[in-house]
Amino acid sequence: MMNPLIIKLGGVLLDSEEALERLFSALVNYRESHQRPLVIVHGGGCVVDELMKGLNLPVKKKNGLRVTPADQIDIITGALAGTANKTLLAWAKKHQIAAVGLFLGDGDSVKVTQLDEELGHVGLAQPGSPKLINSLLENGYLPVVSSIGVTDEGQLMNVNADQAATALAATLGADLILLSDVSGILDGKGQRIAEMTAAKAEQLIEQGIITDGMIVKVNAALDAARTLGRPVDIASWRHAEQLPALFNGMPMGTRILA
């Protein structure tokens, strides 16, 4: 079996039927012309935000990570492992793709520990066992994995989806693409940066050009590139016509170098 490709979905993608239609059409085209197994990892911050707003619950973030108190983890689990995950499975079904919905704890695929007590139920993802997902891939299924994990003590954890995708890529020896709302990392003039090193990223963070959630995304991509020993791409889902080429290894956004 070829090494898998993990496609991490993020941003407002899950909120846009047009975007999901484009994405799944691209996935169908890719699967028809390539034998390479695919895995989807997703968060769903927009789904969570809508739910929290409807319940009049405050959304707090610290260093770009969502603070998840004990009384909110059940709600966030329902939004990510429930609504967001099953929405993607429904789109896969619509496009005749045999998909299986998972969370990080299934088959111990990704190990999770608590990241920081101040963040509450927020987990740190580390590589786990490839057995379950490899078995699904060998049988032609598309695993769709939410970024909810569980600790060895049985505590549910909300994991940053970029970090979750990185840990799963390390588990499977997979390549990784981080799809987001933006076409890559932008410089101070709003121009896309084609390649990014750790030194360049540190410089842009110090200058305040890379901020908030993008810091988390860039650090996750740098961590992934180092862990995997190969480049990681950050790109946009907005250009559907480019997605099959992107999935095939053509750089379309910002390529993060190890």
From Swiss-Prot:
Top EC class for this record: transferase
Database matches in Pfam families: AA_kinase
Q: Which GO terms describe its cellular component?
A: cytoplasm
Sequence positions that bind ATP = D181, V182, S183, G184, I185, L186, I209, I210, T211
Family matches, as PANTHER family:
N-ACETYLGLUTAMATE SYNTHASE, N-ACETYLGLUTAMATE SYNTHASE, MITOCHONDRIAL
**Encoded by which gene?**
argB
Q: How does it assemble?
A: Homodimer.
Which SUPFAM superfamilies does the annotation name?
Carbamate kinase-like
Q: What is this protein called?
A: Acetylglutamate kinase
Q: Where is this site: Transition state stabilizer?
A: K8, K217
Q: Does the keyword Cytoplasm apply?
A: yes
Function as written in the Swiss-Prot or TrEMBL entry = Catalyzes the ATP-dependent phosphorylation of N-acetyl-L-glutamate.
Protein residues bound to substrate? G44, G45, R66, N158
